[in-house]
C-alpha cells in the first residue's frame, strides 16, 4: 500500500500537466480582444453525436445574440499550381465577441485547427477564470472556419436566404456543425461534398449560411442550400471567392457582383491567377476588411500546403499570430 502512496503525487502531477497543456486548462490569452488559444486533447464524442443525434454530457444551447443584421464575411481560395494553396477569411461581426483558436485531434478523425466565436458559449470580453471553463468542452462543436491535417479548409458566410435539406432519412446537423463534420472526416473537397450529402442542415432562420471549401490538391467549392436542395459550385479557375450573396442563383461574371468585397477579392485573385503568398493573402484580406458597426473581428489565412495558420485580430495587420498544424499526406 505504501508504494501506491509514493507514486500518487507523481500521477497527480502528470494529470495536472495534461490538463494544463492539453485541455480546458491549457487556455491561453494572447491579446486584449481577447483572442485565446487552446489544445483540446482526446474525444469530444462527435462521432457518437453523428450516430445518435445526442450531445455528450448535455445539450449545447448557444447563447442568443441579435442576428437581425447579416455577417459581412469574405472568404477566398488561392489555388495556383505555381505556389502554395491558401484559404483566407475575414469574419465580420460584433466587435466585443471573444475568439478562440482551437486545436483538436480526435480519435478516428483528423487533427484540425479552427476559429470559434466564444460569445456563443456565453463568454464575453472578461478574463475566463479557471472555474469558468466548463463550456469550453463544447467548443469543438462551434467552429466558424478551420483547416485539417489533410489540407482541407472551410469558411462560412451569411446569406440573405437559404433552406437546409429536410430528408427524413438523414440526421440533421446545425449550421456550424457541418464545418466540424468536414474538418474531422474529409481529406478532399470531393469527400466533403459526399459527407454533406448524407446529412440535413438546420440554419438559424435569421442568418442562413453558405460555405467555401478548399483542399491542398487545388479544388474548391461553394456549397449552398436553396429550396431544400444542396447546390455545389466548383472552382473553374485556380481561385474562388464567396461573400454574402447566393451564387447559385445569381452567379456574377468576373468581378461584377453587387458586393464590393467580392469584386475586389475576385479581381486581385484573377490578376494573380490564384498565386498568392501568405503575406499577400493577408494584404488582400486587409483590403476587404471593414470598420463600423460590424467590423472585421479576425482575419485568418490557412496554408493548405504547409499547415501554417496566420491570425490577425481587430484589423491590426502589424500584429500577426502564427501557428502550425502538422500536415499529413492526402491519400
Segments from the language model and where they lie:
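N-terminal mature-domain region immediately after signal-peptide cleavage
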Residues: 5, 14-180, 184-186, 201, ...
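A surface/extracellular/periplasmic glyco- and lipid-processing/surface-interacting theme
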Residues: 154, 161-289, 294-296
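Single-pass type I membrane protein transmembrane segment
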Residues: 9-10
Amino acid at each position: 500500500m505504501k508504494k501506491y502512496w509514493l507514486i500518487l503525487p507523481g500521477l497527480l502531477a502528470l494529470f495536472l500537466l495534461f490538463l494544463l497543456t492539453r485541455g480546458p486548462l491549457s487556455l491561453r490569452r494572447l491579446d486584449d480582444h481577447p483572442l485565446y488559444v487552446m489544445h483540446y486533447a482526446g474525444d469530444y464524442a462527435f462521432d457518437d453525436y453523428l450516430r445518435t443525434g445526442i450531445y455528450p454530457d448535455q445539450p449545447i444551447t448557444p447563447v442568443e445574440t441579435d442576428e437581425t443584421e447579416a455577417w459581412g464575411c469574405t472568404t477566398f481560395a488561392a489555388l495556383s499550381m505555381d505556389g502554395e494553396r491558401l484559404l483566407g477569411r475575414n469574419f465580420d461581426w460584433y466587435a466585443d465577441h471573444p475568439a478562440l483558436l482551437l486545436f483538436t485531434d480526435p480519435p478516428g478523425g483528423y487533427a484540425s485547427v479552427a476559429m470559434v466565436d466564444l460569445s456563443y458559449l456565453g463568454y464575453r470580453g472578461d478574463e475566463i477564470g479557471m472555474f469558468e471553463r466548463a463550456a469550453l468542452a463544447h467548443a469543438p462543436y462551434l467552429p466558424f472556419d478551420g483547416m485539417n491535417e489533410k489540407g482541407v479548409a472551410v469558411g462560412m458566410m451569411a446569406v440573405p436566404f437559404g433552406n437546409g435539406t429536410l430528408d427524413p432519412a438523414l440526421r440533421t446537423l446545425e449550421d456550424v456543425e457541418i464545418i466540424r463534420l468536414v474538418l474531422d472526416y474529409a481529406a478532399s473537397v470531393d469527400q466533403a461534398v459526399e459527407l454533406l450529402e448524407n446529412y440535413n442542415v438546420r440554419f438559424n432562420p435569421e442568418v442562413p449560411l453558405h460555405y467555401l471549401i478548399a483542399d491542398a490538391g487545388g479544388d474548391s467549392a461553394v456549397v449552398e442550400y436553396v429550396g431544400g436542395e444542396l447546390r455545389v459550385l466548383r472552382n473553374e479557375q485556380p481561385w474562388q471567392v464567396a461573400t454574402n450573396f447566393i451564387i447559385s442563383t445569381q452567379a456574377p461574371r468576373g468581378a461584377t457582383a453587387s458586393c464590393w468585397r467580392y469584386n475586389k477579392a475576385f479581381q486581385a485573385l484573377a490578376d494573380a491567377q490564384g498565386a498568392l503568398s501568405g503575406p499577400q493573402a493577408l494584404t488582400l484580406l486587409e483590403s476587404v476588411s471593414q470598420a463600423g458597426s460590424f467590423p472585421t473581428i479576425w482575419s485568418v489565412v490557412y496554408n493548405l500546403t504547409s499547415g501554417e495558420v496566420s491570425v490577425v485580430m481587430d484589423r491590426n495587420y502589424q500584429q500577426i499570430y502564427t501557428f502550425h498544424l502538422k500536415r499529413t499526406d492526402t491519400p
